[in-house]
Amino acid sequence: MAQISTTSEHTIQTLERIGAHSHVKGLGLDDQLEPRPSSQGMVGQRAARKAAGLIVKMVQDGRIAGRAILMVGPPSTGKTAIAMGMAQTLGSDVPFTMLSASEVFSLEMSKTEALMQAFRRSIGVRIREEAEVVEGEVVEIQIDRSLTGATKTGKLTIKTTDMETIYELGNKMIDSLQKEKVTAGDVIAIDKASGRITKLGRSFTRARDYDAMGSDTKFVQCPEGELQRRKDVVHTVSLHEIDVINSRTQGFLALFSGDTGEIKPELRDQINIKVGEWREEGKAEIVPGVLFIDEVHMLDIECFSFLNRALESELAPLVIMASNRGICRIRGTRFRSPHGIPIDLLDRVLIISTKPYELADLKQILTIRAAEEEVSLKPEALEVLTRMASETSLRYAINLITTANLAAKRRKADEVEVADVRRVYNLFVDEKRSVQYLKEHAEQFMNESDEYGDIDGLNSGAPIIGRQASAGAVQA
């Protein structure tokens, strides 16, 4: 008797990455740009959100390019979250580039070149062109294969409400149809110049072909009139992409590899002239985007002098900078300045300040983060985490949500309790307890000499994190 073999079923774990700001979906403003108490993942910071909403409105109207905004506030007050909310509100049509100030320091290219490339990435060019397209509903697709299977030929029957035509298909078009999974009843558009096929949706006449449809299935009317028609097509590319494509040393392949290297300023000048001609002819329009530079105090004096000039150029995006420093040394100099930024650049920026969160706001943020990470918290555990967030930092409390959930799963519980939070609180120390431990065991650590930073400041109660001592450490 033949044996019946059974195979075990394995579930494939999908990769899910929950970022620090993945819960932010916008700025949470109403139509009058008034901030809602809790909306789109944003809580508190009403004045800062309203100011950011005003900036977004001016960007959408194209009236604030070439300006600079500085967001300042203590750590864990939502500066980066507001920038992410601005990016979500602006949408995919407006170029938004996020950059950390330490990213500009590279051995492959100069600091000013890295900043210039970030500037050019943040400026879009909307190019309009007229294309011939074939648009209609697919009636039938016939594909014939040769005996060897090397060649494929076929016929495509496509119709509108007024006419119907049969097209002969070659290998490339058959592959494109199979890639887009085009079947009878789909409404498609074929670009005659490039052969690109776009699936517009499914015809209403085929709505009852299947009992069940996917949520992404879109039903459209069968097109009317001629099959072949002229259509305005809009492409949005950044100035940096045009620079790379026209760079002889790399060419367009550098767009995929990312190894663009330095681009000559003469080439950029020629592209600016050409884009200016397209604007005058009505073929293109400039879309000023947003460049967000986080931890801007990490830039040095050469970068700041470059920003002074770049902000006043004709093609400049809106530059948003964020810093959590107070009065500290400007990198590359011996001078001290507010937020580590030179006075002449501070004179050019609009400053938005963020304030520490209140207890109710912290509780709401932790609730949103727990829902985002699919963690069920008991009310008592949420209260303990809120108190921890106010006494230590918001980031520390958010990190404890995931670890406390793991501790709850170890004891096969569905909800995180206070005992789980206390367990991980004892396992992972926060910044204040770490400093206290360092004070108690200072002699056992390898310390730097007084020339760079006096460890005795620990014993005298001098502030360490995010204050004066950190500015000295950055300069060292």
UniProtKB/Swiss-Prot annotation:
GO cellular component terms, A-Z: Ino80 complex; NuA4 histone acetyltransferase complex; R2TP complex; Swr1 complex
Keyword rRNA processing on entry: yes
Record localization: Nucleus
Binding site for ATP: V72, G73, P74, P75, S76, T77, G78, K79, T80
GO molecular function, one term: ATP hydrolysis activity
Listed SMART domains: AAA (SM00382)
SUPFAM superfamilies, per the entry: P-loop containing nucleoside triphosphate hydrolases (SSF52540)
Keywords assigned: Activator, ATP-binding, Chromatin regulator, DNA damage, DNA repair, Helicase, Hydrolase, Nucleotide-binding, Nucleus, rRNA processing, Transcription, Transcription regulation
Documented EC number(s): 3.6.4.12
Pfam families according to UniProt: TIP49, TIP49_C
Record GO biological process: box C/D snoRNP assembly; chromatin remodeling; DNA repair; regulation of transcription by RNA polymerase II; rRNA processing
Principal location class: nucleus
Catalytic reactions on record: ATP + H2O = ADP + phosphate + H(+)
Family as reported in the entry's similarity comment: Belongs to the RuvB family.
Function comment: DNA helicase which participates in several chromatin remodeling complexes, including the SWR1 and the INO80 complexes. The SWR1 complex mediates the ATP-dependent exchange of histone H2A for the H2A variant HZT1 leading to transcriptional regulation of selected genes by chromatin remodeling. The INO80 complex remodels chromatin by shifting nucleosomes and is involved in DNA repair. Also involved in pre-rRNA processing.
Oligomer status and interactors: May form heterododecamers with RVB1. Component of the SWR1 chromatin remodeling complex, the INO80 chromatin remodeling complex, and of the R2TP complex.
Identification of the protein by name: RuvB-like helicase 2
Organism: Mycosarcoma maydis
Source species taxonomy: Eukaryota, Fungi, Dikarya, Basidiomycota, Ustilaginomycotina
Gene this chain is encoded by: RVB2
